[in-house]
Amino acid sequence: MENEVIEKNFQIARLAEIAPTPCPCGQSRRAFMNEENSVASMHLVEIREDSELHYHKVMTELYYVLEGEGHIELDGQIHPLSVGTAVLIKPGCRHRAVGNNLKILNVPVPKFNPADEYPA
């Protein structure tokens, strides 16, 4: 199977097989980024220790911690992250996740748009 299947009524992605893309928090494997989809995308993100504070004007992001531990900075407040933690980040919230061996699932709504990523 290819790393993404796109059909009229469904799509399937193998996140581990998608090439990583640099992002403010580390490396991201982005699924459902095709033209046929505008609802949301799904990203498997490996978080770095030196992640960059940023924000979005349009996107809401949902984070779910899959592996590791670390913390997330949300508008200047630090909150711990561990396996099973979920975070909802609204537009305008300046944020960054920080960790070592920290892996999250990120669901941007609507679909991720690089033009909606701003340094804080």
Show which residues each predicted segment covers.
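A short, N-terminal "cap"/entry segment at the start of jelly-roll beta-barrel domains
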Residues: 1-40, 120
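A generic fold-level signal
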Residues: 24, 37-39, 57, 81, ...
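Conserved short histidine dyad/triad with adjacent acidic residue
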Residues: 41-57
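A cytosolic small-molecule/anion-sensing beta-strand core signal
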Residues: 43, 66-67, 82-83
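Glycine- and acidic-residue-biased ligand/ion/polar-headgroup-sensing regions
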Residues: 58-70, 75
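Short acidic-glycine-tyrosine-enriched beta hairpin
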Residues: 76-92
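Ligand-binding loop in jelly-roll beta-barrel domains
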Residues: 91-117
